[in-house]
Regions:
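S-adenosyl-L-methionine
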Residues: 2-22, 263-304, 308-323
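Short, flexible coil/linker elements and helix-boundary hinge sites characteristic
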Residues: 268, 330-331
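Core catalytic lobe of class I
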Residues: 1-261, 301, 306, 317, ...
Length: 340
C-alpha cells in the first residue's frame, strides 16, 4: 500500500529544489530514477546557475545523488545523463554513494555541437546503475525490448533468432536514419537528439531528451504501475513517457515556468498513447529504386555476396561499395606467400 505522503506527491511535477523534495519523500519509495542534471557548462537556465566552481558542483551532485539513492527501493535503478566534463567524476560519486554501475552507455548523434578549438561534441553519457546488484529490474524478456539482429535486419535470414537480441551500449543517430530511412546497422541504436525542427519538441526547453530513448530505459528498468522519478523534470519528457507507458511518476524543477509548461504537456497525453519519434530499428530493408551495380564489375566473392544479399545497399551506399571493391582487390592479390 502506498505511503499517504507519497500518494499525495505522485503523478505531479513539484516546484522546488530536488534535494529538499527527495529528502521529504519516504525512503525506498521509487522504482526508477532518471536524472538529466545541469552539466555545469554555462547553459542559460531561467533560475539555476550553471557556472559553479568545480568543487561546488561536485558537492551539490553528491547531495542530490545521495538523495536519489535514499528514495530508491532496494531493487531500484538509477540512470544518469551527463556530458564529458563530469562523466567520470559523477560515476565515481554515484559508486561512493552506494550505486553499482551496470553499463556506461554512449548516446551518439552525428549532428552535434560544432566546436572550433576541439573535436565537435556529438554525444552524451548515460550511466546505468542499480542499488542492489543481486536484485534489480531488467526486462530482457519483453519482445518490445529486443531488436532484430544483423541477419534479420540486413539479410532477412530466416535462420536468425525470431525474437531478436538485446541492444548493445552504443546508441547512434544520424539524420538519414530517421523514420522512413533504412539503417543498415548490426549492433547500434538510433535515437535523434530533439532538434528545433522535430515535431516532438516541447518548445520551451533547450535540452530535451527524445521520447523513444526514455521509452527504452523505462520499459527495460521498470514495470507497469511502478514509480518513475525525474529530479530535474525540465521539459517533462521522462514523466510524459512514464505516463504513456502506464507508470506512476513525479518530478521536481526549480523553474516555475518549466513546471507549468510540463504540467500542460502531461495533460495532453493518456496511458497507452504512442511515444513520439521514430521507433527503431527498421524491421526490414525497403526496396531501393534506381540502378544496381554495373554488370561490368568483376565478379568476386565479396561483391557477389553484396549484390545477392543486400541489393538495397548497392544503390544507397556508394562509399561502402568502394570498400567492398577495395577488399575484393586486396583478397585477389593476397596469398600466404605474401606473409613470408
Amino acid at each position: 500500500m502506498l505511503d499517504d505522503m507519497l500518494a499525495r506527491m505522485l503523478n505531479q511535477i513539484h516546484h522546488g529544489d530536488c534535494i529538499a523534495g527527495m529528502n521529504g519523500m519516504p525512503e525506498g519509495s521509487v522504482d526508477l530514477v532518471f536524472a538529466d542534471p545541469p552539466f555545469n557548462i554555462g547553459y542559460e537556465y531561467d533560475v539555476y546557475e550553471d557556472s559553479r566552481s568545480r568543487h561546488e558542483y561536485l558537492d551539490w551532485s553528491r547531495a542530490w545523488i545521495a538523495a536519489a539513492h535514499r528514495v530508491l527501493k532496494d531493487d531500484g535503478t538509477f540512470w544518469l545523463a551527463i556530458g564529458d566534463d563530469y562523466a567520470a567524476e559523477l560515476k565515481l560519486l554515484s559508486q561512493e554513494v552506494g550505486f553499482h554501475c551496470r553499463s556506461w552507455v554512449i548516446w551518439y548523434y552525428t549532428f552535434g555541437v560544432n566546436c572550433k578549438a576541439k573535436f565537435s561534441r556529438s554525444h552524451t553519457h548515460l550511466l546505468y546503475f542499480v542499488k542492489n546488484p543481486a536484485k534489480f529490474t531488467f526486462r530482457a524478456d519483453l519482445l518490445e525490448n529486443r531488436i532484430p539482429s544483423a541477419r534479420q535486419l540486413v539479410y532477412a535470414d530466416k535462420r536468425a533468432n525470431s525474437i531478436g537480441r538485446l541492444p548493445d551500449d552504443t546508441w547512434i543517430l544520424r539524420p538519414q536514419d530517421l523514420e522512413g530511412c533504412f539503417s543498415a546497422d548490426e549492433d547500434t541504436w538510433y535515437f535523434p537528439r530533439v532538434a528545433g525542427t522535430f515535431k516532438e519538441r516541447a518548445g520551451f526547453h533547450g535540452c530535451q531528451m527524445p521520447e523513444q530513448l526514455l521509452g527504452r530505459i523505462i520499459r527495460f528498468c521498470s514495470n507497469e504501475g511502478e514509480t518513475v522519478l525525474d529530479p530535474f523534470s525540465g521539459s517533462a519528457t521522462t514523466l510524459t513517457v512514464a505516463k504513456k507507458l502506464g507508470r506512476r511518476f513525479l518530478g521536481f524543477d526549480l523553474s516555475l515556468e518549466y513546471v507549468q509548461r510540463g504540467r500542460d504537456r502531461l495533460a495532453n497525453f493518456q496511458v497507452g498513447d504512442p511515444l513520439a519519434g521514430a521507433a527503431e530499428p527498421t524491421a526490414s530493408a525497403p526496396a531501393t529504386p534506381g540502378k544496381r551495380a554495373s554488370k561490368a564489375r568483376p565478379t568476386t566473392i565479396a561483391n557477389t555476396k553484396a549484390a545477392t544479399k543486400t541489393p538495397a545497399l548497392s544503390a544507397e551506399l556508394p562509399f561502402e561499395n568502394e570498400l567492398i571493391d577495395a577488399f575484393a582487390n586486396t583478397s585477389q592479390s593476397f596469398s600466404p606467400a605474401s606473409l613470408r
